[in-house]
Protein backbone atom coordinates (compact mmCIF):
# COMPACT_ATOMS: atom_id res chain seq x y z
CA UNK A 1 0.00 0.00 0.00
CA UNK A 2 1.34 3.44 -0.90
CA UNK A 3 2.18 5.87 1.92
CA UNK A 4 0.79 8.70 -0.20
CA UNK A 5 -0.88 11.70 1.32
CA UNK A 6 -3.77 13.90 0.23
CA UNK A 7 -3.25 17.34 1.69
CA UNK A 8 -6.09 19.89 1.77
CA UNK A 9 -5.18 23.58 1.82
CA UNK A 10 -8.44 25.45 1.11
CA UNK A 11 -12.14 24.60 1.21
CA UNK A 12 -15.49 26.08 0.21
CA UNK A 13 -18.76 24.15 0.16
CA UNK A 14 -17.57 20.53 -0.24
CA UNK A 15 -14.97 21.64 -2.78
CA UNK A 16 -11.33 21.77 -1.80
CA UNK A 17 -7.94 22.81 -3.09
CA UNK A 18 -5.56 19.98 -2.34
CA UNK A 19 -2.42 18.14 -3.31
CA UNK A 20 -2.10 14.49 -4.28
CA UNK A 21 1.39 13.09 -3.68
CA UNK A 22 2.31 10.32 -6.13
CA UNK A 23 5.34 8.40 -7.39
CA UNK A 24 5.55 10.91 -10.24
CA UNK A 25 5.16 14.21 -8.47
CA UNK A 26 2.50 16.39 -6.91
CA UNK A 27 -0.90 17.00 -8.46
CA UNK A 28 -3.01 19.97 -7.45
CA UNK A 29 -6.70 19.26 -7.09
CA UNK A 30 -9.36 19.73 -8.23
CA UNK A 31 -7.97 18.28 -11.43
CA UNK A 32 -9.44 17.34 -14.79
CA UNK A 33 -7.85 14.09 -15.99
CA UNK A 34 -7.76 13.84 -19.81
CA UNK A 35 -8.26 10.39 -21.31
CA UNK A 36 -5.33 9.27 -23.45
CA UNK A 37 -5.57 6.24 -25.73
CA UNK A 38 -2.54 4.00 -25.10
CA UNK A 39 -2.12 3.17 -28.79
CA UNK A 40 -3.64 5.99 -30.86
CA UNK A 41 -2.60 9.33 -29.43
CA UNK A 42 -4.27 11.95 -31.58
CA UNK A 43 -3.09 14.71 -29.24
CA UNK A 44 0.47 13.99 -28.03
CA UNK A 45 0.77 13.51 -24.29
CA UNK A 46 3.52 16.13 -24.19
CA UNK A 47 1.07 18.67 -25.61
CA UNK A 48 -1.48 17.74 -22.94
CA UNK A 49 1.17 18.27 -20.28
CA UNK A 50 2.18 21.58 -21.87
CA UNK A 51 -1.42 22.84 -21.62
CA UNK A 52 -1.23 22.24 -17.87
CA UNK A 53 -2.41 18.73 -17.05
CA UNK A 54 -0.24 16.74 -14.63
CA UNK A 55 -2.48 13.68 -14.45
CA UNK A 56 -3.96 11.62 -17.29
CA UNK A 57 -5.93 8.39 -17.47
CA UNK A 58 -5.40 5.56 -19.94
CA UNK A 59 -6.89 2.12 -20.39
CA UNK A 60 -4.90 -0.76 -18.94
CA UNK A 61 -7.13 -3.34 -20.65
CA UNK A 62 -6.41 -1.92 -24.12
CA UNK A 63 -2.74 -1.59 -23.19
CA UNK A 64 -2.60 -5.27 -22.23
CA UNK A 65 -4.34 -6.38 -25.42
CA UNK A 66 -1.98 -4.37 -27.63
CA UNK A 67 1.37 -4.64 -25.83
CA UNK A 68 1.10 -7.78 -23.71
CA UNK A 69 4.16 -8.48 -21.55
CA UNK A 70 6.10 -5.77 -23.40
CA UNK A 71 4.04 -3.22 -21.46
CA UNK A 72 5.47 -4.48 -18.17
CA UNK A 73 9.01 -4.18 -19.52
CA UNK A 74 8.45 -0.61 -20.72
CA UNK A 75 6.05 0.67 -18.10
CA UNK A 76 2.98 2.77 -18.81
CA UNK A 77 4.86 6.08 -18.55
CA UNK A 78 7.16 5.14 -21.43
CA UNK A 79 4.32 3.69 -23.49
CA UNK A 80 2.26 6.89 -23.51
CA UNK A 81 5.32 9.16 -23.14
CA UNK A 82 4.11 10.97 -20.02
CA UNK A 83 6.35 11.53 -17.00
CA UNK A 84 3.73 12.79 -14.55
CA UNK A 85 0.83 11.06 -12.83
CA UNK A 86 -1.04 8.30 -14.68
CA UNK A 87 -4.32 6.66 -13.71
CA UNK A 88 -5.39 3.42 -15.37
CA UNK A 89 -8.90 2.11 -15.92
CA UNK A 90 -8.81 -1.67 -15.83
CA UNK A 91 -11.62 -2.25 -18.33
CA UNK A 92 -14.73 -1.19 -16.46
CA UNK A 93 -15.74 1.08 -19.32
CA UNK A 94 -15.54 -1.85 -21.75
CA UNK A 95 -17.70 -3.91 -19.36
CA UNK A 96 -20.25 -1.08 -19.33
CA UNK A 97 -20.20 -0.74 -23.13
CA UNK A 98 -19.87 -4.36 -24.26
CA UNK A 99 -20.99 -6.43 -21.27
CA UNK A 100 -17.73 -8.23 -20.46
CA UNK A 101 -13.98 -8.44 -21.05
CA UNK A 102 -11.73 -11.46 -21.62
CA UNK A 103 -9.59 -11.08 -18.51
CA UNK A 104 -10.04 -11.86 -14.82
CA UNK A 105 -9.74 -9.20 -12.08
CA UNK A 106 -6.60 -10.70 -10.41
CA UNK A 107 -4.82 -10.87 -13.78
CA UNK A 108 -5.76 -7.26 -14.51
CA UNK A 109 -4.62 -6.11 -11.07
CA UNK A 110 -1.21 -7.75 -11.50
CA UNK A 111 -0.87 -6.11 -14.90
CA UNK A 112 -1.62 -2.67 -13.45
CA UNK A 113 1.02 -3.25 -10.78
CA UNK A 114 3.48 -4.40 -13.42
CA UNK A 115 3.14 -1.34 -15.66
CA UNK A 116 3.82 0.94 -12.67
CA UNK A 117 0.71 3.06 -12.90
CA UNK A 118 0.29 5.72 -10.20
CA UNK A 119 -3.45 5.23 -9.70
CA UNK A 120 -4.91 1.77 -10.30
CA UNK A 121 -8.56 0.73 -10.43
CA UNK A 122 -9.75 -2.86 -9.85
CA UNK A 123 -11.69 -4.50 -12.69
CA UNK A 124 -15.24 -3.71 -11.63
CA UNK A 125 -18.74 -4.19 -13.03
CA UNK A 126 -20.32 -0.76 -13.57
CA UNK A 127 -24.02 -0.59 -12.79
CA UNK A 128 -24.81 2.10 -15.33
CA UNK A 129 -28.12 3.96 -15.50
CA UNK A 130 -31.51 2.25 -15.50
CA UNK A 131 -30.32 -1.13 -14.24
CA UNK A 132 -32.92 -3.06 -12.16
CA UNK A 133 -32.08 -2.97 -8.47
CA UNK A 134 -31.59 -6.75 -8.15
CA UNK A 135 -29.02 -6.82 -10.93
CA UNK A 136 -27.38 -3.64 -9.63
CA UNK A 137 -27.11 -5.30 -6.23
CA UNK A 138 -25.29 -8.26 -7.80
CA UNK A 139 -22.87 -5.91 -9.58
CA UNK A 140 -22.15 -4.00 -6.37
CA UNK A 141 -21.52 -7.26 -4.52
CA UNK A 142 -19.19 -8.47 -7.29
CA UNK A 143 -17.28 -5.17 -7.37
CA UNK A 144 -16.81 -5.19 -3.60
CA UNK A 145 -15.55 -8.78 -3.75
CA UNK A 146 -12.94 -8.19 -6.48
CA UNK A 147 -11.92 -4.87 -4.91
CA UNK A 148 -11.21 -6.61 -1.60
CA UNK A 149 -9.23 -9.35 -3.37
CA UNK A 150 -7.22 -6.78 -5.29
CA UNK A 151 -6.35 -4.75 -2.22
CA UNK A 152 -5.33 -7.81 -0.20
CA UNK A 153 -3.36 -9.53 -2.97
CA UNK A 154 0.22 -9.11 -1.81
CA UNK A 155 2.69 -6.27 -2.33
CA UNK A 156 2.30 -3.57 -4.93
CA UNK A 157 4.65 -1.08 -6.56
CA UNK A 158 3.48 2.00 -4.69
CA UNK A 159 0.24 2.46 -6.60
CA UNK A 160 -2.72 4.25 -5.11
CA UNK A 161 -5.60 1.81 -5.45
CA UNK A 162 -8.92 3.50 -6.17
CA UNK A 163 -12.07 1.80 -4.94
CA UNK A 164 -14.86 1.93 -7.58
CA UNK A 165 -18.25 2.95 -6.14
CA UNK A 166 -21.24 1.45 -7.93
CA UNK A 167 -25.00 1.52 -7.47
CA UNK A 168 -26.24 4.01 -10.05
CA UNK A 169 -29.50 5.70 -9.11
CA UNK A 170 -30.04 3.19 -6.30
CA UNK A 171 -28.67 5.42 -3.55
CA UNK A 172 -28.83 2.79 -0.82
CA UNK A 173 -26.49 0.66 -2.96
CA UNK A 174 -24.21 3.66 -3.54
CA UNK A 175 -24.00 4.13 0.23
CA UNK A 176 -23.37 0.41 0.80
CA UNK A 177 -20.72 0.30 -1.91
CA UNK A 178 -18.94 3.37 -0.54
CA UNK A 179 -18.94 2.18 3.06
CA UNK A 180 -17.68 -1.24 2.00
CA UNK A 181 -14.73 0.24 0.12
CA UNK A 182 -13.89 2.61 2.99
CA UNK A 183 -13.92 -0.28 5.46
CA UNK A 184 -11.52 -2.20 3.20
CA UNK A 185 -8.98 0.61 3.51
CA UNK A 186 -8.99 2.20 0.05
CA UNK A 187 -7.07 5.50 0.04
CA UNK A 188 -9.12 6.99 -2.78
CA UNK A 189 -12.55 6.26 -4.22
CA UNK A 190 -14.16 6.78 -7.62
CA UNK A 191 -17.83 7.17 -8.44
CA UNK A 192 -18.78 5.06 -11.45
CA UNK A 193 -21.23 5.35 -14.33
CA UNK A 194 -22.11 9.08 -14.34
CA UNK A 195 -21.68 9.42 -18.12
CA UNK A 196 -25.07 7.87 -18.80
CA UNK A 197 -26.65 10.19 -16.24
CA UNK A 198 -25.19 13.24 -17.95
CA UNK A 199 -26.12 12.03 -21.42
CA UNK A 200 -29.71 11.69 -20.17
CA UNK A 201 -29.55 15.14 -18.50
CA UNK A 202 -30.16 13.48 -15.12
CA UNK A 203 -28.07 16.08 -13.32
CA UNK A 204 -30.13 15.91 -10.13
CA UNK A 205 -29.54 12.15 -9.86
CA UNK A 206 -25.84 12.68 -10.47
CA UNK A 207 -25.69 15.25 -7.67
CA UNK A 208 -27.55 12.92 -5.33
CA UNK A 209 -25.13 10.10 -6.17
CA UNK A 210 -22.14 12.27 -5.31
CA UNK A 211 -23.62 13.50 -2.03
CA UNK A 212 -24.65 9.98 -1.03
CA UNK A 213 -21.11 8.72 -1.57
CA UNK A 214 -19.45 11.69 0.13
CA UNK A 215 -21.53 11.27 3.28
CA UNK A 216 -20.09 7.76 3.69
CA UNK A 217 -16.48 8.85 3.19
CA UNK A 218 -13.92 10.15 5.68
CA UNK A 219 -13.08 13.75 4.88
CA UNK A 220 -9.43 12.90 4.17
CA UNK A 221 -10.18 10.53 1.27
CA UNK A 222 -10.23 12.07 -2.24
CA UNK A 223 -13.04 11.25 -4.66
CA UNK A 224 -12.69 10.73 -8.41
CA UNK A 225 -15.66 11.07 -10.77
CA UNK A 226 -15.63 8.99 -13.95
CA UNK A 227 -16.65 10.61 -17.22
CA UNK A 228 -17.20 14.22 -16.13
CA UNK A 229 -15.72 16.52 -18.73
CA UNK A 230 -18.43 19.06 -19.51
CA UNK A 231 -17.73 22.65 -18.42
CA UNK A 232 -21.21 22.92 -16.89
CA UNK A 233 -20.95 19.83 -14.69
CA UNK A 234 -17.38 20.44 -13.51
CA UNK A 235 -18.22 23.28 -11.04
CA UNK A 236 -21.01 21.22 -9.47
CA UNK A 237 -18.88 18.09 -9.23
CA UNK A 238 -16.21 20.08 -7.41
CA UNK A 239 -18.69 21.93 -5.18
CA UNK A 240 -20.18 18.61 -4.08
CA UNK A 241 -16.79 17.15 -3.22
CA UNK A 242 -15.16 15.57 -6.29
CA UNK A 243 -11.40 16.11 -6.38
CA UNK A 244 -10.53 14.61 -9.77
CA UNK A 245 -12.64 13.74 -12.81
CA UNK A 246 -11.73 12.17 -16.13
CA UNK A 247 -13.23 12.38 -19.59
CA UNK A 248 -12.44 12.07 -23.28
CA UNK A 249 -14.93 14.88 -23.94
CA UNK A 250 -12.27 17.16 -25.41
CA UNK A 251 -11.79 14.73 -28.31
CA UNK A 252 -15.33 13.32 -28.49
CA UNK A 253 -16.75 16.83 -28.90
CA UNK A 254 -14.04 17.72 -31.41
CA UNK A 255 -14.98 14.74 -33.59
CA UNK A 256 -18.53 16.13 -33.65
CA UNK A 257 -17.06 19.57 -34.46
CA UNK A 258 -18.33 20.91 -31.15
CA UNK A 259 -16.47 23.81 -29.59
CA UNK A 260 -16.42 23.95 -25.77
CA UNK A 261 -17.31 27.30 -24.19
CA UNK A 262 -17.75 28.27 -20.56
CA UNK A 263 -21.50 27.66 -20.74
CA UNK A 264 -21.73 24.57 -22.92
CA UNK A 265 -20.77 23.63 -26.46
CA UNK A 266 -21.36 25.24 -29.85
CA UNK A 267 -21.14 23.63 -33.26
CA UNK A 268 -18.21 25.06 -35.16
CA UNK A 269 -20.52 25.90 -38.05
CA UNK A 270 -22.53 28.25 -35.81
CA UNK A 271 -19.63 30.32 -34.47
CA UNK A 272 -19.05 33.80 -35.88
CA UNK A 273 -16.45 34.97 -33.35
CA UNK A 274 -14.24 32.84 -31.12
CA UNK A 275 -14.97 33.76 -27.46
CA UNK A 276 -11.53 32.51 -26.42
CA UNK A 277 -7.88 33.61 -26.49
CA UNK A 278 -6.15 30.23 -26.50
CA UNK A 279 -3.39 29.48 -29.00
CA UNK A 280 -5.89 27.95 -31.45
CA UNK A 281 -8.51 30.68 -31.30
CA UNK A 282 -5.94 33.44 -31.76
CA UNK A 283 -4.38 31.65 -34.73
CA UNK A 284 -7.52 31.32 -36.87
CA UNK A 285 -10.76 33.09 -37.56
CA UNK A 286 -13.81 30.79 -37.38
CA UNK A 287 -14.02 30.78 -41.18
CA UNK A 288 -10.34 29.91 -41.56
CA UNK A 289 -10.75 27.15 -38.99
CA UNK A 290 -13.66 25.62 -40.89
CA UNK A 291 -11.49 25.42 -44.02
CA UNK A 292 -8.86 23.19 -42.40
CA UNK A 293 -8.51 19.56 -43.46
CA UNK A 294 -10.79 17.32 -41.41
CA UNK A 295 -8.12 15.59 -39.29
CA UNK A 296 -6.27 18.81 -38.53
CA UNK A 297 -9.53 20.57 -37.75
CA UNK A 298 -10.53 17.89 -35.23
CA UNK A 299 -7.12 17.85 -33.55
CA UNK A 300 -6.91 21.64 -33.33
CA UNK A 301 -10.44 21.78 -31.95
CA UNK A 302 -9.54 19.15 -29.35
CA UNK A 303 -6.63 21.32 -28.21
CA UNK A 304 -8.96 24.31 -27.82
CA UNK A 305 -11.36 22.11 -25.85
CA UNK A 306 -8.57 21.13 -23.47
CA UNK A 307 -7.72 24.79 -22.90
CA UNK A 308 -11.38 25.55 -22.28
CA UNK A 309 -11.75 22.76 -19.70
CA UNK A 310 -8.51 23.81 -18.00
CA UNK A 311 -9.81 27.38 -17.78
CA UNK A 312 -13.06 26.19 -16.22
CA UNK A 313 -11.23 24.21 -13.54
CA UNK A 314 -9.00 27.22 -12.82
CA UNK A 315 -12.06 29.48 -12.47
CA UNK A 316 -13.52 27.09 -9.92
CA UNK A 317 -10.22 27.01 -8.03
CA UNK A 318 -10.21 30.80 -7.90
CA UNK A 319 -13.81 30.78 -6.64
CA UNK A 320 -12.74 28.45 -3.82
CA UNK A 321 -9.83 30.74 -2.92
CA UNK A 322 -12.18 33.75 -2.85
CA UNK A 323 -14.92 31.93 -0.94
CA UNK A 324 -17.37 32.46 -3.82
CA UNK A 325 -17.98 28.90 -4.99
CA UNK A 326 -21.69 29.09 -4.11
CA UNK A 327 -22.13 32.20 -6.24
CA UNK A 328 -20.19 30.61 -9.09
CA UNK A 329 -22.29 27.44 -9.25
CA UNK A 330 -25.55 29.39 -8.92
CA UNK A 331 -24.50 31.40 -11.96
CA UNK A 332 -23.56 28.24 -13.86
CA UNK A 333 -26.86 26.55 -12.99
CA UNK A 334 -28.82 29.02 -15.09
CA UNK A 335 -27.13 27.78 -18.26
CA UNK A 336 -29.61 24.89 -18.55
CA UNK A 337 -32.99 24.19 -16.86
CA UNK A 338 -32.03 20.59 -16.06
CA UNK A 339 -28.75 21.76 -14.57
CA UNK A 340 -30.62 24.09 -12.21
CA UNK A 341 -32.11 20.98 -10.58
CA UNK A 342 -28.69 20.38 -9.01
CA UNK A 343 -29.25 23.52 -6.95
CA UNK A 344 -32.15 21.75 -5.23
CA UNK A 345 -29.74 19.02 -4.14
CA UNK A 346 -27.37 21.67 -2.79
CA UNK A 347 -30.10 23.47 -0.85
CA UNK A 348 -31.36 20.16 0.53
CA UNK A 349 -27.82 19.37 1.72
CA UNK A 350 -26.75 22.78 3.00
CA UNK A 351 -25.77 21.26 6.36
CA UNK A 352 -23.43 18.80 4.61
CA UNK A 353 -21.93 21.59 2.49
CA UNK A 354 -21.49 23.70 5.60
CA UNK A 355 -19.16 21.17 7.23
CA UNK A 356 -16.26 22.36 5.08
CA UNK A 357 -17.36 25.94 4.37
CA UNK A 358 -15.43 28.53 6.41
CA UNK A 359 -17.68 30.29 8.93
CA UNK A 360 -15.88 33.58 8.30
CA UNK A 361 -14.51 34.89 5.01
CA UNK A 362 -12.36 37.79 3.89
CA UNK A 363 -14.82 39.05 1.28
CA UNK A 364 -18.49 39.96 1.39
CA UNK A 365 -20.95 37.43 0.00
CA UNK A 366 -23.56 38.27 -2.63
CA UNK A 367 -27.21 37.40 -2.04
CA UNK A 368 -29.32 37.42 -5.19
CA UNK A 369 -32.32 35.15 -4.85
CA UNK A 370 -34.31 32.78 -2.64
CA UNK A 371 -31.75 29.99 -3.19
CA UNK A 372 -29.19 32.00 -1.23
CA UNK A 373 -31.06 31.47 2.04
CA UNK A 374 -29.59 27.96 1.95
CA UNK A 375 -25.93 28.83 1.43
CA UNK A 376 -23.91 27.51 4.38
CA UNK A 377 -22.70 30.87 5.70
CA UNK A 378 -26.27 32.14 5.80
CA UNK A 379 -27.49 28.97 7.50
CA UNK A 380 -24.74 29.36 10.07
CA UNK A 381 -25.97 32.86 10.90
CA UNK A 382 -29.56 31.64 11.17
CA UNK A 383 -28.42 29.04 13.70
CA UNK A 384 -26.73 31.76 15.73
CA UNK A 385 -29.88 33.92 15.79
CA UNK A 386 -31.99 30.92 16.81
CA UNK A 387 -29.93 30.77 20.00
CA UNK A 388 -30.11 34.52 20.68
CA UNK A 389 -31.90 35.59 23.88
CA UNK A 390 -32.86 39.07 25.02
CA UNK A 391 -34.15 40.22 28.42
CA UNK A 392 -35.96 43.14 26.81
CA UNK A 393 -39.73 43.17 26.32
CA UNK A 394 -40.04 45.62 23.44
CA UNK A 395 -38.82 44.75 19.94
CA UNK A 396 -38.24 47.06 16.97
CA UNK A 397 -37.69 45.45 13.56
CA UNK A 398 -36.59 47.36 10.45
CA UNK A 399 -35.21 46.52 7.04
CA UNK A 400 -31.45 46.23 7.11
CA UNK A 401 -29.59 49.47 6.49
CA UNK A 402 -27.15 50.04 3.66
CA UNK A 403 -24.53 50.91 6.28
CA UNK A 404 -23.17 47.83 8.02
CA UNK A 405 -22.98 46.90 10.82
CA UNK A 406 -26.44 48.19 11.65
CA UNK A 407 -25.46 50.05 14.82
CA UNK A 408 -23.40 52.50 12.71
CA UNK A 409 -26.31 53.44 10.45
CA UNK A 410 -28.37 56.64 10.38
CA UNK A 411 -31.41 54.40 10.68
CA UNK A 412 -30.23 53.14 14.06
CA UNK A 413 -29.41 56.68 15.23
CA UNK A 414 -32.91 57.73 14.22
CA UNK A 415 -34.44 54.99 16.34
CA UNK A 416 -32.45 56.19 19.34
CA UNK A 417 -34.03 59.62 18.99
CA UNK A 418 -37.51 58.25 18.32
CA UNK A 419 -37.80 56.00 21.37
CA UNK A 420 -37.22 57.60 24.79
CA UNK A 421 -36.87 54.21 26.46
CA UNK A 422 -34.40 53.02 23.84
CA UNK A 423 -32.21 51.18 26.35
CA UNK A 424 -35.17 48.91 27.09
CA UNK A 425 -35.74 48.04 23.43
CA UNK A 426 -34.34 45.11 21.46
CA UNK A 427 -33.51 46.26 17.93
CA UNK A 428 -33.36 43.85 15.00
CA UNK A 429 -32.86 44.51 11.34
CA UNK A 430 -33.80 41.89 8.78
CA UNK A 431 -32.73 40.56 5.43
CA UNK A 432 -34.86 38.05 3.45
CA UNK A 433 -31.99 35.58 3.11
CA UNK A 434 -30.20 36.17 6.42
CA UNK A 435 -33.38 36.50 8.45
CA UNK A 436 -33.47 38.51 11.68
CA UNK A 437 -30.30 40.42 12.55
CA UNK A 438 -30.14 41.39 16.25
CA UNK A 439 -28.20 44.63 16.46
CA UNK A 440 -25.78 43.12 19.01
CA UNK A 441 -24.55 40.57 16.46
CA UNK A 442 -24.96 42.69 13.33
CA UNK A 443 -21.17 42.92 12.99
CA UNK A 444 -20.66 39.16 12.73
CA UNK A 445 -20.05 37.59 9.31
CA UNK A 446 -21.99 37.64 7.07
CA UNK A 447 -24.46 40.13 8.63
CA UNK A 448 -22.03 42.99 8.07
CA UNK A 449 -20.37 41.46 5.01
CA UNK A 450 -22.91 40.99 2.25
CA UNK A 451 -24.68 42.72 -0.60
CA UNK A 452 -28.33 41.97 -1.38
CA UNK A 453 -30.47 42.56 -4.45
CA UNK A 454 -32.93 45.40 -3.81
CA UNK A 455 -35.99 43.62 -5.16
CA UNK A 456 -39.29 42.63 -3.60
CA UNK A 457 -39.17 39.02 -2.43
CA UNK A 458 -42.14 36.75 -1.77
CA UNK A 459 -42.08 35.89 1.97
CA UNK A 460 -43.70 32.51 1.28
CA UNK A 461 -40.49 31.43 -0.47
CA UNK A 462 -38.33 31.90 2.63
CA UNK A 463 -38.87 28.94 4.98
CA UNK A 464 -35.56 29.60 6.72
CA UNK A 465 -36.75 33.09 7.66
CA UNK A 466 -39.99 31.63 8.99
CA UNK A 467 -38.19 29.01 11.07
CA UNK A 468 -35.80 31.55 12.57
CA UNK A 469 -38.70 33.94 13.22
CA UNK A 470 -40.66 31.30 15.13
CA UNK A 471 -37.67 30.08 17.15
CA UNK A 472 -36.60 33.65 17.95
CA UNK A 473 -40.00 34.55 19.37
CA UNK A 474 -40.34 31.29 21.30
CA UNK A 475 -36.92 31.88 22.91
CA UNK A 476 -37.83 35.42 23.97
CA UNK A 477 -40.74 37.06 25.82
CA UNK A 478 -41.55 40.19 23.87
CA UNK A 479 -44.81 41.88 24.76
CA UNK A 480 -44.64 44.56 22.09
CA UNK A 481 -43.30 44.79 18.53
CA UNK A 482 -42.78 47.96 16.49
CA UNK A 483 -42.44 47.66 12.72
CA UNK A 484 -43.36 49.33 9.44
CA UNK A 485 -46.89 48.19 8.62
CA UNK A 486 -46.28 49.07 4.97
CA UNK A 487 -43.54 46.46 4.77
CA UNK A 488 -45.35 43.61 2.99
CA UNK A 489 -42.55 41.10 3.55
CA UNK A 490 -42.41 41.69 7.29
CA UNK A 491 -46.18 41.96 7.65
CA UNK A 492 -46.53 38.34 6.46
CA UNK A 493 -44.51 37.10 9.45
CA UNK A 494 -45.98 39.51 12.00
CA UNK A 495 -49.37 37.90 11.34
CA UNK A 496 -47.96 34.65 12.73
CA UNK A 497 -47.38 36.18 16.17
CA UNK A 498 -49.72 35.54 19.07
CA UNK A 499 -52.42 38.08 19.88
CA UNK A 500 -50.79 38.72 23.27
CA UNK A 501 -47.97 40.58 21.53
CA UNK A 502 -48.95 44.19 20.76
CA UNK A 503 -48.21 45.25 17.18
CA UNK A 504 -47.41 48.90 16.59
CA UNK A 505 -46.19 50.90 13.61
CA UNK A 506 -43.33 53.33 14.15
CA UNK A 507 -43.63 55.01 10.73
Give the positions of each predicted feature.
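Residue-level preference for long, well-ordered alpha-helices that form the structural scaffold
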Residues: 101, 132-139, 143, 170, ...
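Glycine-rich phosphate/ribose-binding loops and adjacent secondary-structure elements
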Residues: 141-144, 153-282
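Short secondary-structure boundary/hinge segments and terminal tails
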Residues: 66, 130-131, 199, 255, ...
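Gly/Ser/Thr/Ala-enriched C-terminal appendages of enzymes
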Residues: 248-341
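Flexible, glycine-rich loop/tail regions that form catalytic "lids" or insertion modules at the edges
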Residues: 339, 343-378
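Non-catalytic, usually N-terminal nucleic-acid engagement modules in DNA/RNA processing proteins
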Residues: 1-156, 365-392, 398-476, 483-507
Amino acid sequence: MSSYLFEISKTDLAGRIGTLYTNHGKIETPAYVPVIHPVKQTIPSKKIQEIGFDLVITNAYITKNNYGDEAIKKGIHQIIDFDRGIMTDSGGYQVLEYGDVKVLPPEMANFEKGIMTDFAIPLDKPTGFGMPIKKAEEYVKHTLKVSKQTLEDGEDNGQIWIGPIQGGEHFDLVAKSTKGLVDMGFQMLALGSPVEFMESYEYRLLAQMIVTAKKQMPYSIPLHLFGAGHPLTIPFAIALGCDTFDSASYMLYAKQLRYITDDGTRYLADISVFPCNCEICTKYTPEEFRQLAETEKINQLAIHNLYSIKLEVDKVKQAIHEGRLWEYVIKKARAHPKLFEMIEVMTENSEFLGLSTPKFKEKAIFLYSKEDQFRPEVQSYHNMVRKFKSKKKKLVITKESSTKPGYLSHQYSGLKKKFRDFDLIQVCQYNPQLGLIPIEISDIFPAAHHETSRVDFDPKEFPTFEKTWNVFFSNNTFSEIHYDKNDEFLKYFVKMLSKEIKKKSFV
